[in-house]
Every structure is written in C-alpha cells, then in structure tokens.
C-alpha cells in the first residue's frame, strides 16, 4: 500500500496540473478573442487585462466594448442589433446578439461568421440593406446637401440610405440620441481581401517561371487558390482556422457628440476622417494578410 503522504501529495499534484491546464485553456481563449478583434484593427487587451486579475464585470465590459468597435469595422451591417460578449463559467467567451448566444470563441472563428451570415442583408454592392436604427426617419442617399444640413443641425433620430463616395466607397449617416454616426464603407469580403493579398504575394515572387505558373493556375482557381495550391497540403485547412479567413475591415464609423453632432462642418470633417481611416486599415490588412500567406501557413 502506498504511504498516505504520497497519496495526498499525488492528489495535490494532479489538482495543480488540472488547474494549470484550465488556466492555459482560458488564456488561449483570451488570446483568440484578441486575435479576432485584430481583424478589425481593434487593439483588444483582454489577455493582459485578465492577467492583471481584473474582475469578471470589468472583463465583460471590455469584451463588449471591443466587440462593438469591431462591428463598426467588419461592415456586416448589424448596427440595429445589440452586441455583447461575456465570460462563461467554464472559462470560455460567449458572443451574444440581442441577448441571445451566437457562438463561443472556443468553437472557432468560422462558427461566429456562420452565425452572423443569416443575420445580414447585403445588396449586390455588398452594402447592408438593414436600417442602422430600429425606428426613425430614413432619408434617401442622394439627399441634397442643403436638406442633409438641416437634418444634421435640427433633426432628432434619423438616418440616410447609402450614397456613393470617393474611391469606390459608400457613405451614410445617422443620429441616435445625442450621437451622430458617420459610416464610410468599401465592401471587400474576407475572401476578396485574401485574394488581394495573394496577388501581392504572387507579384513579389522573383522566380518568373514560378510566377507565370501561378498566374496560369489563377485563371482556373483564382489568386488565392493558385497560391494555396502551391503550398503544402494542409495550407487551405490552416487558413480556414485563422480569423482573417472570415473577418476583415470593410467599414469605419466615426462618431460625433454634443455640439459637434449638430454641426454640418464637423460632419464633413468626420466623413473625411472615416474615409482616411478606412483606407489606412484596409491597406494594413492587405499587408498583414500578405505576410500570413507568405509565412503563416506552415505545416503543423
């Protein structure tokens, strides 16, 4: 028979190992959430916040704030819904939409994308047909500037439909309470963003014969398909596990409050700021995706 002291020590060690494993899994969930937010250019610091031993309420508030910021950049057109994220008792992070669970981070990024897909209503341009507000006046997108100025300066809750902007962008504006929201969008799905990045990678290949071969393959399989086909057999599956395969920056929302929210000049400045931010974020995304396609799909 084993000594009692050994049994006690052994049980203690097993308990410590189980706690360490659970902590590692939870830390991995926090890091995965931060990585998901990075696809929207959101500097989420949930892993660091959790490491500082912040309480559950503080973590839930930070999770929700990051998710709502990401919703303004993913361009899914779900502004009319309430978005929250919270910790679960078993160490996961649950994503909620209008109070109902949509997916858990542990289920993978694709699961969240699939949950959001039926909620969307995109037109042929990739723009949301949903109103940003549940209620309120909706003006046409081609509203004359003089009338738009009146709405911005005097109207209560309102929104406009999409109108064409510069550089293949689209724009709309809405007011909710004391806040004016200015959105600029350039629809580019995650797949399209990856294809753009694949083009950059192929264009940078110095081996011209190999480059020509990939261009030939792209006629059948597309840029991304050609590049993945030239990698190892698991490259496509590895890519599908990354958040970049499902989410990308397609829009930017700039907000104004107080007196600025009723100033037409401030609105025009916000429009320029949003357009510039969108241009920057989409450019950064393409460069980051190019690096992923070059180096980040190694065999595991």
Curated annotation (Swiss-Prot):
Q: What induces it?
A: Induced to high levels following extreme ionizing radiation exposure. Also highly induced in response to desiccation stress.
Keyword tags: DNA damage, DNA repair, DNA-binding, Phosphoprotein, Stress response
**Practical use:** The PprA protein combined with an immunofluorescence technique can be used to visualize radiation-induced DNA strand breaks in mammalian cultured cells, allowing the evaluation of DNA damage responses. This detection method could also be applicable to genotoxic tests in the environmental and pharmaceutical fields.
What's a single GO MF annotation on this record?
Answer: damaged DNA binding
Q: How changing residue 165 to E affects the protein?
A: In KH311; loss of radiation resistance and DNA-binding ability
Which of the residues bear the PTM Phosphothreonine? 88, 160
What is known about its processing and modification? Phosphorylated by RqkA in vitro. Phosphorylated primarily at Thr-88, and to a little extent at Ser-128 and Thr-160.
Which BP terms from GO are recorded? cellular response to desiccation; cellular response to gamma radiation; DNA repair; double-strand break repair via nonhomologous end joining
According to the UniProt record, what happens if one changes residue 160 to A?
Answer: Slight decrease in phosphorylation. Lack of phosphorylation
Disruption of the gene: reported phenotype: Cells lacking this gene show a reduced growth rate, do not exhibit a decrease in the efficiency of natural transformation, but are much more sensitive to ionizing radiation than the wild-type strain.
Q: Which residues carry this modification: Phosphoserine?
A: 128
- Top-level taxon of origin: Bacteria
Summary of activators and inhibitors of this protein: Phosphorylation increases DNA binding affinity.
What this protein is reported to do is described as: dsDNA-binding protein that contributes to the ionizing radiation resistance of D.radiodurans. Plays a role in DNA repair and genome reconstitution, and is necessary for recovery from severe genomic fragmentation as a result of exposure to severe levels of ionizing radiation. In vitro, binds to double-stranded DNA carrying strand breaks and stimulates the DNA end-joining reaction catalyzed by DNA ligases. Thus, PprA plays a critical role in a non-homologous end-joining (NHEJ) pathway for the repair of radiation-induced DNA double-strands breaks.
Report the protein name in the record.
Answer: DNA repair protein PprA
């Amino acid at each position: 028979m084993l000594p009692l002291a050994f049994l006690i020590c052994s049980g203690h060690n097993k308990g410590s190992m189980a706690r360490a494993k659970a902590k590692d899994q939870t830390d991995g969930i926090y890091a995965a959430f931060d990585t998901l937010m990075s696809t929207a250019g959101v500097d989420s610091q949930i892993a660091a916040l959790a490491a500082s031993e912040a309480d559950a309420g503080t973590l839930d508030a930070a999770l929700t704030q990051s998710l709502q910021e990401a919703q303004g950049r993913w361009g899914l057109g779900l502004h009319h819904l309430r978005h929250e994220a919270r910790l679960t008792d078993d160490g996961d992070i649950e994503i909620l939409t209008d109070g109902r669970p949509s997916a858990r981070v542990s289920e993978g990024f694709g699961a969240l994308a699939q949950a959001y897909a039926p909620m969307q209503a995109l037109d042929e341009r990739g723009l949301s047909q949903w109103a940003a507000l549940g209620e309120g006046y909706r003006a046409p997108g081609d509203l004359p500037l003089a009338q738009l100025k009146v709405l911005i300066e005097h109207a209560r809750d309102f929104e406009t439909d999409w109108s064409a902007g510069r550089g293949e962008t689209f724009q709309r504006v809405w007011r909710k309470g004391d806040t004016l929201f200015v959105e600029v969008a350039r629809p580019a799905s995650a797949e399209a963003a990856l294809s753009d990045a694949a083009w950059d990678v192929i264009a940078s290949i110095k081996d011209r014969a190999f480059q020509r071969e990939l261009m030939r393959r792209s006629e059948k399989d597309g840029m991304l398909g050609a590049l993945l086909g030239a990698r190892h057999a698991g490259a496509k599956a590895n890519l599908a596990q990354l958040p970049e395969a499902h989410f990308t920056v397609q829009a930017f929302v700039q907000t104004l409050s107080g007196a600025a929210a009723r100033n037409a000049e401030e609105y025009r400045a916000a429009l320029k700021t949003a357009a510039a931010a969108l241009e920057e974020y989409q450019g950064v995304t393409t460069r980051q995706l190019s690096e992923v396609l070059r180096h980040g799909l190694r065999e595991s």
